[in-house]
Amino acid sequence: MNAYKGKITFNKEQCVLCQTCAFVCPAGAINISCVEPQKSYDFIIWHNTCTVCGNCTYFCPTGAIALSNTLAEATPQSEKYTSITANMVEYGECANCHEPMINVPLTMLKRGFKTISEPITSLFKLCPKCRRDHTFAKRAL
């Protein structure tokens, strides 16, 4: 099977809003902007601006961005911003205090832990403050 660099795909469930993809994109084809603080962000990819360099895919820590095998079509410069992928990445909420937080996808946990157990997944459903409090409370002093 011949694989080639194609159109960028985006999985908003995997995105942790680190904005690395936008930072490493030499063409400026990725824009992440706040819609409502602590609630949601717009994630936009301008396909006609993309040079298909693959930097976003390579540096994305969760695999939220991938290059597909669907060949992108060439379009005139006047249509530069017309072919887009737009998604809204929404914050989740802490299972304990219900404060807004960025969800930690399973792919990210698999990169950090050898095995994923229920205590680990439940711990990462907590915001950083509640996670610290929970971990500190479990320590024997």
Predicted regions and their residues:
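Short, structured interface segments
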Residues: 59-74
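Short tyrosine-centred short linear motifs in exposed loops/low-complexity segments
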Residues: 19, 53-54
